[in-house]
Amino acid sequence: MSLLSIKQTAMIGVAILMTMAHCTRTPEWQAKNEELITKYDLTKRELSGVPEPSIESDLGPGAVTNLESLPQVQLHPDVRARISWGTGVMLSILDLAPNAEIPEEVLPADRFVFVLEGSIRHLVNGSPVTMISREREEPDGVHGATPRTDFVYLEEGTKSAVVAGDSGAKLLELYSPQRLDYLQKAGVQELPNSVPRLKNTADANVVPGKVYDLYEMQRTELSSGAYGIILSAKQMQLGFVSIEPGAIVPPHIHPEEQLEIVLRGDGRAIILDEKQDVKPNDLVRIPSNMVHGAEAGGVGYDALSIFWPPRPDHQEMAKAATQAFRAIIPEGAQVELVADGKKTKPELHFTEGPKWVNGKLYFSNMYFDKDFNADPKRSSTVELDPSTGRYRNIIEGQMQANGMYPYKNGNLLVCDMMGHRIVEMTTTGKVVRVVVNSYDGKPIDGPNDIVVDAKGGFYFTDPQFTMEPEKFQSGRGVYYVSNDGKVTRLLEPNAFAMPNGIVLSPDGKTLYINNCYDDESWYPVNSDKDNHIWAYDVNPDGTISNGRKFATLLLTENVLKRKGRSSGADGMTIDKAGNLYVATFYGVQIFNPKGEFVGIINLPSFPVNLCFGDDDMKTLYIVSLSKVYRIRTNMEGFVQYL
């Protein structure tokens, strides 16, 4: 269950948990709370239009319950649930046996439902839709499927029925207000005849009845190191937030009640100034204006915060983040499959280095097995006609090319990675000449990615990702080749654990370099570059200086779990406004010219490289393993055509 989750500061109330038996007695915790509000100079606010609670929560204020400790309640044959509730919301974790059914019902409250495992056939007002969950594949030379968590928001009064798939399903339901029939089945006594609704409802930012994939929803940078997906409904608001390792959420308060579930990772909850380690499936209720904070551990953590009523400040933050993303990726733009190299011929394996030249897309087709063993004889360079999706090899069996860049005379500079050289090639596949194959009297190892400057020189990365156990150069490197052919190593060997993507700003004054792998037990080099994009000033002679962190790339949950810093950052491209697009395990991560996170383009498998194309240069072409995708943008891409 790797959803996403938590905020920092008074922005997304990241309340996380703590077992405090002495805090469950209202007078005691409130007295201490008032002292802490004064101590931290916090401003207490009260809400209007919030009904008096008619049902007492099963969770004490500030006290932790692990979801696994809750008793299971049978809702229907082969459908069992663990149920908990706050003042205005209810959550239930449903386990459905294979093909189990939840009969059609008229929903008595607004509801979100997320598919955590398996699949369901969901009837919404009689219309069927399939909803699924999929785990992330560990990326290698063959595999790379990205995760999927389908969800839907339905309003009170909607007709709903569910049938589990052949392997069953696990669902997360969130209701506001609480369901009286669920409470009856949970054995709660003396229930009221009805549950009051909020007088002042919020505007939903999701369409009722529309199925979404959680990983398609845009993340908001809530504070340094905290990114969240904010889903607002009329009666409640959800915040799926991820906090990076070591981040600290300072003490804060908010007038909305909050239920929070830890989904992944480790950390310490800080409630009423006391700390406690927390683990996945821990659940806590934070009453209105209770002082709380958190500290992320070595693997960071994800959590789901459920707010009642919805927080307007969160909604405004999410709105602003969406507007920034939509300024680049227009509303309605969808990732489109252009070519599937497992269904058409010639077969595509591990696609790389796409570049747009004279109305065609050119890219490398690298053969790898799952362990990244290469074979130049099974590799090729490909020309694709985007108007038809048809493609052909322009050269095959002669080199295992990687990055490419448009060069003089309408030709391409091509990184022949396994051939230890960079060549100039025509768009018909003819090698014109070897441009560089050595540095300091020794062969270069494996040129990976490349970018040309306005003077005809070029930069390339060499992460030594080659088959020879003994390398020629003394470490991973970044190089500059001037227009007259002089080769300069720009950084000390192994300054980057795995230098990969490289791109210049449109004005040519800044060079950006990313780092693919770092801090892994199985990788031979560690560096201090971690999961960052680094920016360097470009000097008049092509050398670089003033290296600095430009942006931080989000890490996937499997990398965080092993305490790695491998973003999978590969190819990068840039638009004329200076926005940077980075292919990573997480998707295409977009940053503005200041290095601020803008959003993510999600794909069915992790993107490897990308470029702008089409007549207006506003279409982003993205290669991913055996497939080629595209998506329209509002921005014009920058390429240094000579």
Question: What kind of region is each of these model predictions?
Answer:
Residues 65, 209-212, 316-642:
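Sequence-structural signature of mature extracellular/luminal beta-sheet repeat domains
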